[in-house]
Amino acid sequence: MMADLMRIEHDSMGTIEVPAGVLWGAQTQRSLLNFAISTDRMPVELIHALALIKQAAASVNCRLGVLDEVQRDQIIKAASAVASGLHDDQFPLRVWQTGSGTHTNMNVNEVISNLASQANDEPLGSHRPVHPNDHVNRSQSTNDAFPTAIHIAAVQGITNNLLPELEQLIAAFARKSDAWSDIIKIGRTHLQDAVPLTLGQEASAWRDQIASAHSRIQSSLIELYPLPLGGTAVGTGLNAPARFGQETAAQLASITGLPFSSAKNKFAVMASHDGLVNAMAQLRMLAVALFKISNDLRLLACGPRAGLAELHLPENEPGSSIMPGKVNPSQCEAMAMVCLQVIGLDSAVTMAGGSGHLQMNVYKPLIGFNLLHSIELLHDACRKYRLAMVQGIEPNRIKIQHDLEQSLMLVTALAPEIGYDKASEIAHLAHEKGFSLREAALKLGYVSKEDFDRIVNPALMTSARL
């Protein structure tokens, strides 16, 4: 009875049983059996990008005379269905497989071949009218097709998802910066009291940190637009028409609306993946910025009654199973964990990028998985961060004013008038005796009360005045 649920598929290794109803074939089945490692599946974004490559390649191969029109049309129809996500359940392979990504490339080739067979009432696995290698993979090698798919999926994820979300997060912090421009607060360096600034100025730093990260990520795309497709096995273009890479890149640019081009030096973009490593590094830089911002927000909101408590963060859910009424900065904590995860993923990509040998880097699935996973993590985290926290942050004006008035570092404004040493003496006396700065200054006789009130004005200390 079990035999009725299986079919026999053939490849260069011989025969193998494959579940009767699935669209994948022999090579995919072998990978499933040999690499049942964890549950990390190849990202569907990469599968869709590979399908776009097959679609574009079929069109170009026909135009260049190495594929007939029937084969072209069958491949384009099936590949378009795969690229649109209609058959995502037919791509079960794990990330942890051969380092070239060959198994996943063949998974796509086999599914497209079998979709064509279905459409023509041919048996699954018959390779009629379209063969997975001879036709779907025509003029390609996994060595150029798989990294091309990573480039495409990464550019799409960054351009269509991550960058627009960052722009909204930048705008959210910009609105806070504008709204808080009149709130003067005490600054802190070394986690100790420092001179004043406005809460708006503090928020402007968060805004511009993210804006700088946005700019760096956007700039990294320049290295991802050139595609290795057309280099085939080692970059020479063996078994591909001379214009295949150039024309297929142009076709992919047309399909995606993104400025892809054919890499001038296929050897460089196939033997190494520096552009992908750089893009991942810029995601790490974004994570570093978001981690710092989350730490700032947690510190400024700590309390609510026994901490800094300068900010009120939105209260979204109970924070403790034992302490009634406790609310935690959970969005900051989630963001911090995402940031640390991305930083770790970047370390793996960096090692993988430098570990290629000669004409081939055999860490492609890891690089692609970590890069695309990081894009997804950062996009999702930034979206929830903005909607569930940043938009709802409110200042605690009473606490901010109280702390400002208590700070000894306002004495810094006196230093240009009476000198550093005398200003220090005022601060030490005030701290030791519990005096206000004004009381200490007048007691020591270093400044008149009129001059003190004129000089030690927090509103005048938030910008250069000499």
Swiss-Prot record:
Name of the protein described by the UniProt record: Fumarate hydratase class II
Keyword entries, A-Z: Cytoplasm, Lyase, Tricarboxylic acid cycle
Similarity-based family: Belongs to the class-II fumarase/aspartase family. Fumarase subfamily.
Other observations noted: There are 2 substrate-binding sites: the catalytic A site, and the non-catalytic B site that may play a role in the transfer of substrate or product between the active site and the solvent. Alternatively, the B site may bind allosteric effectors.
Swiss-Prot/TrEMBL catalytic activity: (S)-malate = fumarate + H2O
Catalytic residues (positions): 190 (proton donor/acceptor), 320
Species this protein is from: Prochlorococcus marinus (strain MIT 9313)
Enzyme class of the recorded protein, top EC level: lyase
Residue(s) at site: Important for catalytic activity: 333
Molecular-function GO terms, alphabetical: fumarate hydratase activity
EC number: 4.2.1.2
InterPro entries in alphabetical order: Fum_hydII, Fumarase/histidase_N, Fumarase_C_C, Fumarate_lyase_CS, Fumarate_lyase_fam, Fumarate_lyase_N, L-Aspartase-like
Function: Involved in the TCA cycle. Catalyzes the stereospecific interconversion of fumarate to L-malate.
Main location as per UniProt: cytoplasm
